[in-house]
Amino acid sequence: MRYVISLLLLIGGLSCSDANQPLPGPVGVFDTGAKTVTGQWPLATPSELGLSAESLLNLHNDVLQERYGWIDSLLIIRNGRIAFEQYYEHDYRAVYGDEAQTLGPLVVNSPSGPYNYFNAFWHPYFKDTQLHSMQSVTKSILSAVIGIAISRGDFPDLDTPVLSFFNVDKTAHVDDQKRAMTLRHLLTMSEGLRWDENIPYTDPKNTFTVMARSLDWVQFTLDQPMESEPGTRFNYNSGASLILGQIFLQSTGIDIEAYTAQHLFQPLGITNYEWKRTPFGLADTQEGLFLSTRDLAKIAYLYLQKGRWNQKTIIAESWINDSLRAAFKLNDELRTGYGFQWWSQRYQYQDKSYVAYLGKGFGGQRPIILPDFDMVIVLTGWNILPDKPFLHAEEAIERVLSSVIE
């Protein structure tokens, strides 16, 4: 049964008159074992962390009323302590039951398999556990592991050509542009391959959907023709992260799941996770991870702390900075950028401009890092149909920061 931090935390920050009003939704219990940031998280009332309990309760009410579709969890950490944590139950077997039976863009290869996004056995929670699908937040964690491997001398220089790891004679559309493609280009999704992942995943013309029906996803991606000079244009491509996963295996001789467990998860105290495999048997480094909300928060908090955890360096600060720095500034209207498999989001607060850093996963997975407020926001959800309301990162930041009182 999934644990829930009690809304009594919020009551502690409300006035007596507010506290006497009935609370929406189920009231859970404190996790009294939450004592240290290296194991369980320490708890605090919102007011102790300079946040308005009333504002957070308003946000909670909107989530309960499904203003933002199906959000599964919301966790807010400030100054290293949990200010708010709530889990929202949805009967996904009932919600998506009909769609789960028929092959289509979101039911790939087999209705009973791990790439049926409507199958409640696999999504959003792994087999009724607390492990939630991370979707493309997996890419951000892949970046973290590559950074660790580079610092340990286990991964090649980022300017190494991609084709040096593959049989060129068995790769389609090889030209000078493809020969110029490097690991850095894969990390920043500027590799130049022809790829359209900007249309909804429900559209069978989405290149990712076409790839998912193939047996060897890495080779499928590598075989795509070039459409731009590497390093000149950002184009979101999940296949690029899969190529990085294959190169990781070839470079280190170690499966990335085992390497991640030893060098990232173990130092953070992450012991429960699941990692899907592609049809070819490779760890799915573009969307395959399942983590609990609290463990995802550990990843975000590690980046907030510049790679340090429990006074030890897990990821080099230089890699953290390079990962979060926007290699490409994307949409001026949305004010977004993209680094090493991490997004950046510019936002306004009290007439000042700030930058947030985040991972983005299909369905609503959002670890959001706000360095200027010593804050981490983690959202999980399963809004996988294009017509469903959605809590976008900028609005999530705005809603949470509206609760800041000091």
Language-model features: locations:
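Sec-dependent N-terminal signal peptides
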Residues: 4-12
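N-terminal leader/targeting segments and the immediately adjacent pre-domain N-terminus
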Residues: 14-126, 150-155, 214-215, 227, ...
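Active-site SXXK
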Residues: 57, 80, 103, 113-114, ...
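Short, charged, amphipathic alpha-helices and their helix-cap/turn boundaries
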Residues: 86, 96, 100-122, 160-163, ...
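Active-site helix/loop module of the DD-peptidase/beta-lactamase fold
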Residues: 122-123, 128, 152-193, 223-226, ...
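Active-site-proximal alpha-helical segments within enzyme catalytic domains
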Residues: 240-247, 287-308, 365-382
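Active-site Gly/Thr loop motif
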Residues: 270-273, 277, 321-378
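Structured C-terminal helix/loop/strand segments within mature extracytoplasmic catalytic/sensor domains
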Residues: 359-406
